[in-house]
Curated annotation (Swiss-Prot):
UniProt name for this protein: GMP synthase [glutamine-hydrolyzing]
Gene: guaA
Organism in which the protein naturally occurs: Pseudomonas savastanoi pv. phaseolicola (strain 1448A / Race 6)
SUPFAM superfamilies assigned to the protein according to its UniProt record, in alphabetical order: Adenine nucleotide alpha hydrolases-like (SSF52402), Class I glutamine amidotransferase-like (SSF52317), GMP synthetase C-terminal dimerisation domain (SSF54810)
Free-text function comment from the UniProt entry: Catalyzes the synthesis of GMP from XMP.
GO CC entries: cytosol
Enzyme class (EC, first level): ligase
Organismal lineage: Bacteria, Pseudomonadati, Pseudomonadota, Gammaproteobacteria, Pseudomonadales
Active-site residue list: C86, H181, E183
Ranges where the GMPS ATP-PPase domain occurs: 208-400
Subunit architecture: Homodimer.
Binding site for ATP: S235, G236, G237, V238, D239, S240, S241
Amino acid sequence: MALDIHAHRILILDFGSQYTQLIARRVREIGVYCELHPFDMDDEAIREFAPKGVILAGGPESVHEANSPRCPQAVFDLGVPVFGICYGMQTMAEQLGGKVAGSELREFGYARVDVVGKSRLLDGIEDHIDADGLFGLDVWMSHGDKVTKLPEDFHILASTPSCPIAGMADDARGYYGVQFHPEVTHTKQGGRILSRFILDICGCEALWTPSKIAEDAIAQVRAQVGTDNVLLGLSGGVDSSVVAALLHKAIGDQLTCVFVDNGLLRLHEGEQVMAMFAENMGVKVIRANAEEQFLNNLEGESDPEKKRKIIGRTFIDVFDAESCKLDNIKYLAQGTIYPDVIESAGAKSGKAHVIKSHHNVGGLPEEMNLKLVEPLRELFKDEVRRLGLELGLPYDMVYRHPFPGPGLGVRILGEVKKEYADLLRRADHIFIEELRKADWYHKVSQAFVVFQPVKSVGVVGDGRRYAWVVALRAVETIDFMTARWAHLPYELLETVSGRIINEIEGISRVTYDVSSKPPATIEWE
């Protein structure tokens, strides 16, 4: 009988915290499957999910205010361990008979908590011991309210000068709460604390590993698809590449990929995709050379949103035309990943309960009448990358920087022209090449060049040159929700600028974007 890698599972209830997805990623990293659901998940659904433990995440509300979110009673009726984090601790305390109040002194940022009580959760976990033999932890706080009275059978686990009950425990029931955030890297022992709860207290086994995920996904695809044929839009991005590798391993020649070359790809990207999948792996790939069609449709349009829509519609037209040439296609494969599913479910707000299919291909015509196969829909991006490596995809492909769906179309400001795209892809190639040489490519989260439809005077030899301006953009980020501009060495910027201006005749000036997000976005359009 095949191993069920979902058998040991953790339920995470979302109360609106910006860190909730991070909790789920940390649980997965420990090797245990988990799912994220809104705080008002139906009682019957909770029982059917049958978790080995429950984590109550944080949130921006105040427990003592009217109509603030509450944990379903079914969670406390399950008889499994429960771990409340920040707001999760507060609502647990209040619902089990304790009290919560606003605090005059709010705690945001780094803090030290003293471990003042023994418990299965924190015993043996510390960052330092003071002269009095008191254990301390360096943690990240983000709260205004605090627990002022413990529920019955709980004892104080940790405290700070402004928050005497910074942690609480009821070892008999396996109920724990902490006011700090163990899921963020700023809490140095956070990983150990979560591991202690999940592996030791909940008794979960680490079944969620890349090799087991690959085996499970292959088995699931074979069971779903049977002998039918599957169509995949292959973009060369991480998600579609991993789907292609996975499906090829699962069903071989039953898979056909359509690679739409829109003329807005990176330098040599089309050739690289064909070499990797068609030549090296033996995947059936149809390359649709549609550069002229895309550029004709984009002619004269400079509005960013309209450009995106034109590119999306043209992709659908090309993809549909190619798929009509194929016989007996029953399934459409998509690279939907777990954050897409969460977003579609509205988990952050808790307002939506139905998880809808996330059509990341972009609204394919309903008359195609194909059933969906989405083998990555349970995985976070970092898990997709690890799965890609497990399936034999090259590291450089799996860990490439994100590339927007509309491609260079949104990195060319204003109207898109072939001349601009050709100049931009060469400049971008130089930038990425030099980042790799200087060992900076994997130190930044995303790097690219933006073409500006502005001309500037330059000097080449004894003559003047009136040519285009480009901007370099490199950012560092954890979640792409916020980002800071990367402080690249001046010598590296000088090398990149010199190469672009000297090697590309149509460019006379290179600038560096020092805008962070917010207020700027990462992409310019």
